[in-house]
């Protein structure tokens, strides 16, 4: 996938998404806290102004390079959880990386036509969006190593299933898109994480061979806004 192809998705939007455009703004105050320990997939103990509290983490990934004792995080008050606060972002490589996966589809909706269906049932799965003759699945990415963004950071049977469903849809004549949101701006290209989930990697490359379009968009947290930085390509390998 070359740079010109990576811009196609913005061109089908009801408006052109320029680099530097704010795709989400937090209305809640963001507080600095420090990680003490991760209790389980969705619960983290932090210290806020010297007080130990439990906060919600809405990201099932391993996040070992982001959620570890002593690391700086941003938290905000949220509703609908057992805890008062949720982790919004974690600090790494001189920047904050947004971790809340509830925001992914909100952000993705900025890049597609205004008329669309959400959570469309396909086989035994649900695909995030459908518009016109196109099905679009969204994946959030937070792992970057040596300027390469990787997904997933933990084995994902659900992710593999989504790719299989997209391939079946393409065989029926539909268009299929995988939109990857890299929630940081220090990556130059993207690869599926073969080391962590080799089965997902195989499905990823096989799906591309069958016509799946992949778009990778990067973002930055600036103040209380998530800002679109730009697109990055797939890294060059013997499979691209």
Curated annotation (Swiss-Prot):
This is Sugar fermentation stimulation protein homolog. One of its GO terms (molecular function) is DNA binding. It holds the Pfam family SfsA. Belongs to the SfsA family. InterPro entries: SfsA, SfsA_C, SfsA_N. It comes from Saccharolobus solfataricus (strain ATCC 35092 / DSM 1617 / JCM 11322 / P2) (Sulfolobus solfataricus). Signal peptide: none annotated.
